[in-house]
Amino acid sequence: PQCDSLIARTVGSQQMLTCAAPGYLVQHGTPQSPDDLARHQCLHFLHGGRVSRWRFQQKGKETAFQGCGRFSADNGEALLELALSAFGIVQLPHYLVQTALDSGSLKSVLSDFQPKPVPVMAVYPSRKQLSPKVRALVDMMGEAWGKAV
């Protein structure tokens, strides 16, 4: 919904990564393209009760995928735990999965189709009513997110 009294400012971006546990991939195979996901258990994030679409870059353009799976949740950490337990393939922000990828607990899949980074937004009331503390927080978020990514 659009609200004229709110301002949205991009403070950073996050890369979404598609991954699965090695055990899941041994049992079900490794998808070679986003189309292959239709034959896999996908662990989807819920936004407002709706299953989110996964985004991919394919042949220079962005495509979306909304598959089916045994589980969906509105909690990234819960989806991460399900993926680590070999329940399916998940697409989550890099900051949630990077440690598991580094340790080998998860394997990246479809890296040739990696989507563009997703913007991280700070949403706040109109600048007319913006307190110095809120302005400082939003500025700090932009600086911190830029260093973290």
Regions found by a protein language model. Name each.
Residues H94-T99, S103, F113-V149:
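C-terminal effector-binding regulatory domain of bacterial HTH transcription factors
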Residues Q2-A8, A100-L110:
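Ligand-binding "clamshell"
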Residues P22-G23, E77, Y95-L96:
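Alpha-helix/helix-capping structural signal
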Residues P1-A73:
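Acidic, Gly/Pro-rich loop/turn segments at junctions of secondary structure
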Residues S72-L82:
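Short, surface-exposed, low-complexity cationic segments
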Residues L80-S105:
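A ligand-binding cleft/hinge motif common to bilobed small-molecule-binding domains
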Residues R9, D35, L80-E81, R135:
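Alpha-helical segments flanking ligand/cofactor-binding loops in enzyme cores
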